[in-house]
């Protein structure tokens, strides 16, 4: 239903945010920013 679609979108957005934060962290740790 509609709830499942919304949940899926939110999960995807959360993954994207977490992924970009991890990338920034890796970049800072390796000093390659």
UniProtKB/Swiss-Prot annotation:
Subcellular location: Secreted
Keywords: Amphibian defense peptide, Antibiotic, Antimicrobial, Disulfide bond, Secreted
GO biological process per UniProt: defense response to bacterium
GO cellular component: extracellular region
Main subcellular location of this protein, as a coarse class: secreted
Intrachain S-S bonds: 27-33
Alphabetized InterPro entries for the sequence: Antimicrobial_frog_2
Domain of life: Eukaryota
Tissue: Expressed by the skin glands.
Role: Antimicrobial peptide. Active against the Gram-positive bacterium S.aureus (MIC=30 uM) and the Gram-negative bacterium E.coli (MIC=30 uM).
Family recorded in the similarity comment: Belongs to the frog skin active peptide (FSAP) family. Brevinin subfamily.
Name of this protein: Brevinin-2DYb
Organism name: Rana dybowskii
Lineage, opening ranks: Eukaryota, Metazoa, Chordata, Craniata, Vertebrata
């Amino acid at each position: 239903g509609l709830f499942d679609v919304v949940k899926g979108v939110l999960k995807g957005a959360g993954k994207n945010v977490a992924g970009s934060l991890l990338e920034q962290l890796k970049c800072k740790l390796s000093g390659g920013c």
